[in-house]
Amino acid sequence: MSEDLGSVCSVKGDRITFFLNKRVNLTFGQIVRVDSKNNQSFYARVVNAESRSTLETGEQLREAEGKETFGPYSSYKNIDAVLFLEMNHGRVRSPTFNPNYMDKVVSLNKEDSRLLRLEGQLVMGVVRSGGQTLDNVGISIDALPRMIGMFGMTGSGKTNTELMLNAQLIDNSPRTAGLIFDFAGQLLDGKEIGGKGLSNHPLFHNKVGFYSAKEERLRIGLRTLVPLKLSTLFPGIGYPQYRLANELYKKLGSRWIEEAREVYVVKGQKGIAELAGYSNRTVIEALMSRLLGLGTVLFPASDYSFVDNVVQNISKGITCLIDISGITSEEQHHIVCLTATGVANHYKRMWEKRYEQWQKLPTLLITLEEAHEFLDPNRPKTIFSAIALTYRKYRVGLNAVTPRPSRINPDVFAELWTKMIMKTELKADRDYLTKNAPYLEYSDTEIKMLDIGEALLISEPKIRFAVPVRITHYLEYLDKKEKVDYNLPSSKTLEALDENLERLQSISKDSNARA
């Protein structure tokens, strides 16, 4: 049931102002419906509110001091809202005109949610309407390759939003899969965000692959690094260094990095010059400095690469969570870029050479925390710029997560068709969002005042306006999920295990006595 909020008092272009009824709750960003004539309605978002008085200044002062009381019409509140949709005889589209003076303004109901088609397969939360919540709101699977951005200051609820989105990818496997780079090590166990993470998802054991530097599962053998991969490993590397690497590779084969490092340690720059037939000292020292910086833990002398296992898992619809906390920022950069390149290029090759098999691959979303470090226009370009700009047709999507949207390359930002905007306090970032994101021209105040767990959701072309959303708390989501029965045999009791241990120890003692 819709609540009567007030009536229109003025209209200009796409902005309306309406009187707010007494004792009505309203919030910045709330969506309201304006019922007009001829079975026509308009939808608008609240962007500003003002309290005013009809009294003269002297009368206001006397009223403030309690010396005089005036009637109920001595003060009023008017609300500014921006039109974004029109409904005419059941058909919803962008506004072709605007409402009339004194048209009624009402709150949304569940029927409005249905007409606005806000629920996608990947449910993120519920629509906020004043102090109430309405139907579910979500992102469609088709929106994943159109790229996503999650923006908000630290503590605004980004990690919870990441968990919710990736949990939905797991739920929709094998149709969808995720590649998640966790910089802070929070997503597995939910550290500092409630104590539950993706490891608590009912499908974790058969739908998620976990890789961590702490468990030494992030290994990329030096013999898998051909010269072509150097631009991925070291963005901004010059052509002369690549040419030198290619000469070393031709002479030494797959062990070129190991043997070149040995020669350089023993003979220095002259040894490399003789080996490659290349005498530029500056180029040799620059390349060898980079190669010597590859640590033996992450880059052992072998032909094994965990990236191959990641590609295999994702191809089967298994989401891969890569914990890169606890290693240096440079090592994080290496792991992230090499892994994302390997997976994205697999999708590209399949599309080009095995189209029928490509059609069976899950739609992929790569979640990249600290995205501004990889998408800054003032830094060398990485694979993530290419993914955002050109990999849509391969069904590879990027989820750029960052507290600093203003540091993202504008060309990349324009390709993020789905945006989840949480509380943002830095004015530079709010200005960037309101100037570069559609439907947010008047939303600076609203973005600043969002509460923890609240967001504005835009997901073109399905959701062509900013929807006020309360993101579902991940712990609540887990509570509602059914446990999965893996049909495993029941565990033995501790007493039975102790008896077996005593029996084995007794047998061992008898054996030693005979010996």
Identify the meaning behind each predicted range.
Residues 299-364, 375-378, 382:
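Conserved helicase/translocase P-loop NTPase motor core
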Residues 334, 451-515:
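Conserved P-loop NTPase motor module
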